[in-house]
């Protein structure tokens, strides 16, 4: 079944450190945002290759369950002679339940912290320096029991895949803006630069797949419960190295706040 749960925390504050009359000379602020979500669900992507599409295109006469209350699988289809009409006939509900598309869970965690300082020595002239830090981590677990739907769609042993990823980046931004008027002419000028860094040594990915599990249920489907001496596949690598530097400027003008 599909499920989605989300939890977020957001905190913002701003403090005036130096004030002269109606002029806020030095201001400090921070933004903190944390989110955590968990999701599980069926395959929905790919217009012609997802569980909803397969159910819509399935033979409506094929039962979902057999007389014992179990899912209508290969032996039932073969006994009833369905393969005489189409060798690819299958039960789309059984296909969904007996695969990682219907047995999966993803967890995501995100933390963003921003601190900034604004200095306004004279009215309209504002310098703003900002530093931000962002961290993300996620995990995924998908389980497929042993099954046989058709002669070509089958899995001889159960299987579980787990992966985890983590990473972080930081960014520095500096801007200088000046807002002023000359009679009925209004100007707003801004220049700035930004630098963002993420990459090697700042994140990593790890994934492993194992089969022949001790238990044939979702709750205990973990790599460590495999009877095999080692995972069928395993890989891990760092995130790619990348950085972005930008310089920008902007001029806004209006006449008498009309044009």
Model-predicted regions and their roles:
Residues 7, 110-111:
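C-terminal, structured domain-capping segment
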Residues 14-110, 128-246:
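Surface-exposed loop/interface segments of Gram-negative outer-membrane beta-barrel transport/assembly proteins
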Residues 249, 254-259:
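Short, intrinsically disordered, charge-balanced linker/junction segments flanking boundaries
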């Amino acid at each position: 079944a599909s499920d989605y749960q989300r939890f977020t925390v957001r905190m913002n504050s701003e403090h005036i450190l130096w004030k002269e009359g109606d002029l806020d000379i030095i201001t400090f602020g921070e933004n903190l945002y944390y989110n955590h979500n968990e999701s599980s669900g069926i395959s929905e992507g790919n217009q012609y290759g997802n569980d909803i599409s397969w159910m819509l295109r399935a033979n409506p006469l094929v039962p979902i369950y057999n007389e014992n209350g179990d899912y209508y699988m290969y032996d039932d289809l073969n006994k009833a002679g369905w393969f005489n009409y189409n060798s690819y006939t299958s039960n789309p509900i059984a296909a969904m339940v007996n695969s990682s598309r219907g047995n999966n869970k993803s967890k995501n965690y995100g933390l963003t912290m921003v601190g900034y300082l604004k200095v306004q020595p004279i009215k309209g002239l504002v310098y703003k320096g900002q530093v931000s830090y962002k961290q993300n981590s996620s995990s995924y677990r998908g389980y497929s029991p042993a099954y046989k739907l058709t002669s070509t769609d089958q899995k001889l042993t159960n299987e579980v895949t787990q992966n985890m990823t983590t990473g972080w980046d930081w960014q520095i931004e500096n801007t200088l803006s000046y807002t002023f008027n000359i009679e009925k002419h209004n100007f707003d000028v801004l220049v700035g630069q930004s630098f963002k860094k993420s990459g090697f040594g700042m994140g990593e990915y790890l994934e492993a797949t194992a089969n022949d599990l001790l238990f044939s249920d979702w709750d205990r489907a973990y790599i460590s419960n495999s009877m095999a001496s080692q995972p069928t596949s395993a890989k891990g690598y760092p995130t790619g190295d990348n950085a972005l530097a930008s310089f920008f400027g902007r001029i806004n003008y209006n006449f008498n706040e009309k044009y």
